[in-house]
UniProtKB/Swiss-Prot annotation:
Cell compartment(s), UniProt: Cytoplasm
EC supergroup of this enzyme: hydrolase
Record-stated family: Belongs to the DEAD box helicase family. RhlB subfamily.
Its biological purpose: DEAD-box RNA helicase involved in RNA degradation. Has RNA-dependent ATPase activity and unwinds double-stranded RNA.
NCBIfam families xref list: PRK04837.1 (NF003419)
Keywords, sorted A to Z: ATP-binding, Cytoplasm, Helicase, Hydrolase, Nucleotide-binding, RNA-binding
Domain Helicase ATP-binding: 40-219
Cited Pfam families: DEAD, Helicase_C
Protein name: ATP-dependent RNA helicase RhlB
Intervals of motif DEAD box: 165-168
Naturally occurring in which organism (per UniProt): Shewanella sp. (strain W3-18-1)
A single GO cellular-component term on record: cytosol
Positions of the Helicase C-terminal domain: 243-390
Cross-referenced InterPro entries: DEAD/DEAH_box_helicase_dom, DEAD_box_RNA_helicase, Helicase_ATP-bd, Helicase_C-like, P-loop_NTPase, RNA-helicase_DEAD-box_CS, RNA_helicase_ATP-dep_RhlB, RNA_helicase_DEAD_Q_motif
Amino acid sequence: MSETHLSTQKFADLPLHPEVKQALAENGFEFCTPIQALSLPVLLQSKDIAGQAQTGTGKTMAFLVATFNHLLSTPIPEGRQINQPRAIIMAPTRELAIQIAKDAILLAKHTRLKVGIVYGGESYDVQRKVLDQGVDILIGTTGRIIDYVRQGIISLTAIQAVVLDEADRMFDLGFIKDIRFLFRRMPDANQRLNMLFSATLSMKVQELAYDHMNDPVKVDIAPDEKTSKNIKEEVFYPSQEDKMRLLLTLIEEDWPEKAIVFSNTKHSCENLWSWLEGDGHRVGLLTGDVPQKKRIRILEQFTSGQLDILVATDVAARGLHISDVSHVYNYDLPDDCEDYVHRIGRTGRAGNKGVSISFACEEYALNLPAIESYINHSIPVSNYDSSALLEDIPAPVKIPRKHPAGTRNLRERAGAGRPQGAHRSGGRPPRHDRTRRHS
C-alpha cells in the first residue's frame, strides 16, 4: 500500500484488544488509511456507522478490526448454541465474500474466533460441515445464508456485530429483501454493533441504514470525488472500423501489467476475448455464463499473474477485488454512470497509480455527457492516427467451450516474451508517438 494513502493514525495508538493489535502488527499494518482513521474511533465506542468509501480504501480492514475487537471485548451471549454465529458479514458477490474471508483469517490467527464462509455455486454439504462445527464470524452472500437460516442450520439470534458491505450493489442486484429478512431475525439494533459501507450513500441506502441500525454516524471520505485522483482518465472517439485495432494497439503500446477490459454485452466480451487471444495475449473471459468453478480458476490465474488481461461484463465483474490492476479499458461506455465509477475503481487502488481508457464509439458516445456530469469533471480527449494502428493482426480464435479460457500463451512459445512496444513481427518500432496524440 502506498504511504501517501495512509493517515498519521497508528493502529497501536487505538484502544484495540491486544490480540487484534498483535495480528495487525504481524501483517504489517502500522498506519490507518483515512477511512480506518475516521471509522475505528467511532466503532470502538460501540457506535454504529454508515460509511461512504470507494473500493481500495481499506474499508474491509476497518470493519474487520472493529468486528474482531467487539467480539473479543464483549461477553458471549448467555446460552449461545453452536449454530449461533456472533457476527455476520454480508457481501453482494462470492468473490467479495472470499476476499473478506481471506483478510479475516489474518486477524483470526491469534484469537479464539472461528471464521466461516458460505456462498452459492459451491457444495452445500461442504459448507454445512463447517457451520456444524460452529463459527463466530459468518461471512457470505445473502442467498446462501438465508438457505441455512430457513433450514435451522444457523440461527441469528446471538448476533452481536453486523456488516453490510457494498450496500449500493446490494440494491443493484436486488438483494434488499434478503437483507431485511436477515435483519428481522437478529437481536434489536441497539443490542449489536452495526456497520454499513457503500460507494454511494444514496437515499435508499441511508433509509436501509436508519431502518436497521442504531442512529448510525455517517463517515464520508472525499464525498465530492467519485473517482480517484490516482487514476489517469482519457477517452478516444474511434470509428467502429478502428475500434478493435485501436484497443490492440493501445495494449501493445501500454503493455499493462494487469488490465481489465469492460464491454456491455456477453457477445462483445466473447468477441474481445477471441481477438486478444488470437493476438497472443494471456487473457481470461468473465461473463454471466461462466461456471462458478471456472470463474474462480480464471480469477486465481489473473491474480497470480498467469493471465495479464481480463475481459468482463459489469455483472460478472461485480465484487471483484484484485490488487495491482494497472489499466482499465472501457471498450464500451457503460449505460449506467455508477458502473463507470465502479469499473475504473478497479485500478488506482490503495494509493497506487492507475490508467482508465474509454472508447466513445458511435453506439455508446451519447453516454459520455451523463457520465461526466455524474463524476463532476470532463474526461480528457485523446486523438489517434488511424494509419498508425496495427495492421498485421492475427485472426480471432474460437472460444474453447470445453477448455479454460486464456490457456494459450503465444508469448511463451515465442521465447521470453515480447519487449514493451514490440510487435510479434519483431521489427516494428514502438508507436507511442505515432498512434496517440493528446489535444
